[in-house]
Amino acid sequence: MDTEKMITTPTHWPSPAKLNLFLYITGRRDNGYHELQTLFQFVDFGDELTVTANRETSSITITPEIPGVATEDNLIWKAATALQQHTSTTFGADIQLKKVLPMGGGIGGGSSNAATVLVALNHLWQLNLSDDQLAEIGLKLGADVPVFVRGHAAFAEGVGEQLQPANPDEKWYLVVKPQVSIATVDIFTHSELTRNTPKRALSTLLEQEYVNDCEKIVRMLYPEVDKQLSWLLQYAPSRLTGTGSCVFAEFSSKKEAELVLEQLPDTVSAFVAKGRNISPLKETLAEYQSAHPQSI
């Protein structure tokens, strides 16, 4: 490895949100984990990480600190140190996070941050790990991290670990974040949660109306989510993503989505974004690889 070729200037990487366009719970395993079928799609809106590789030290610095999150619990730090440990590299990095995605919204903010760090540092540290290797590291950090690492919209089965690329329509979305925090465990352990939705082929699911099996329980337990979803449904097909708390409405144009956004009170957190089957992270990586090929 020629460390003189290492890029040590700041590099900028997107950390996009994701939506679960549908989520079906098809069973429960003996260990308590739920079998599911879900469709992940990225959007062109998210956090941004400025990553600067450091060949002089192995330290990982992250700024700013996230209130209430210790460094060792920060998925960005966990991802960087996991990559160091897996490869025994002695390099470090300075990482700046521009946070715009709400935490705990079911849109993958933390998992996306972790994946962006893995992809960025794999390139900057010239490690040459494959997507499969990065996804394996990422899976230990969170169930959704591999989807973000691979960077393609995906149909997931099993407990979410079985992925196959998918190409759903790239619609415009209005995503709304109700001001509540949802405990995923409360949803998946609820006695009234649907757990026996029949498994279906992806081709069949893509032709049917999309549903989230968690939505009924979340709306029942969290009136604020029910309120926002009921409001969105006046304008367009709308659903919960993951176990929430974010909800989204789908539109055929940016203008339609923005017109509805304008009617939301300023106190409501929301954004308009376009569905993307190829992650903005993958596009950025390709640009950096083209400009700085790893010819070592």
UniProtKB/Swiss-Prot annotation:
Keyword ATP-binding part of the UniProt annotation: yes
Record-listed ATP binding positions: P102, M103, G104, G105, G106, I107, G108, G109, G110, S111, S112
Keywords: ATP-binding, Isoprene biosynthesis, Kinase, Nucleotide-binding, Transferase
Molecular functions per Gene Ontology: 4-(cytidine 5'-diphospho)-2-C-methyl-D-erythritol kinase activity; ATP binding
EC number(s) stated in the UniProt entry for this protein: 2.7.1.148
Active site positions, chain numbering: K18, D144
Catalysed reactions, as listed in the record: 4-CDP-2-C-methyl-D-erythritol + ATP = 4-CDP-2-C-methyl-D-erythritol 2-phosphate + ADP + H(+)
Pathway field: Isoprenoid biosynthesis; isopentenyl diphosphate biosynthesis via DXP pathway; isopentenyl diphosphate from 1-deoxy-D-xylulose 5-phosphate: step 3/6
GO BP annotations listed: isopentenyl diphosphate biosynthetic process, methylerythritol 4-phosphate pathway; terpenoid biosynthetic process
InterPro entries registered for this protein in UniProt: GHMP_kinase_C_dom, GHMP_kinase_C_sf, GHMP_kinase_N_dom, IspE, Ribosomal_Su5_D2-typ_SF, Ribsml_uS5_D2-typ_fold_subgr
Enzyme class (EC, first level): transferase
Coiled-coil ranges (or none): none
Claim: Plastid is one of the keywords in the record: no
Transmembrane segments: none
Pfam families: GHMP_kinases_C, GHMP_kinases_N
Membership in a protein family: Belongs to the GHMP kinase family. IspE subfamily.
Record function comment: Catalyzes the phosphorylation of the position 2 hydroxy group of 4-diphosphocytidyl-2C-methyl-D-erythritol.
Protein name, UniProt field: 4-diphosphocytidyl-2-C-methyl-D-erythritol kinase
Organism: Vibrio atlanticus (strain LGP32) (Vibrio splendidus (strain Mel32))
Taxon lineage: Bacteria, Pseudomonadati, Pseudomonadota, Gammaproteobacteria, Vibrionales
